[in-house]
């Protein structure tokens, strides 16, 4: 009987690890797109301003280099505007954040399931049914999740393995709990 609980626990732990990684990758992909959006938006504003300054300057002077520079800056401004039309970075940020939030919910369900496995207050079959329900939701979520990049995977690796995101000391947890719930 204990062997059945162990087998189920191993499977749930494996799924839990996968969900932790998937959640962090989706978060990092959203961060990447948000950074790109901020950068492109800043460049767009700067190039639009410089284009206006260049055109106004042409009223007062007729220098060829100013015309060429204004045309180049205008081209960059048009390119960035076209890029924003082709790739809606804000929608991508939202899609990845949404997937990350759904994965967080699944992660919490798996954590609860691991606790129930350890308590052994339910039968293995009941726990396996709960696990199956979670897996079905997870399969749908993975099918609908937006694609991520290798860069997001690398950032997630750093966050989880180097910075130890999602790991808390007892002291950090105690700071956010009432005294009666502190671990001593």
Enumerate the predicted regions with their spans.
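Hydrophobic alpha-helical transmembrane segments
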Residues: 62-75
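Hydrophobic alpha-helical transmembrane segments of multipass integral membrane proteins
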Residues: 45-56, 72-82, 106
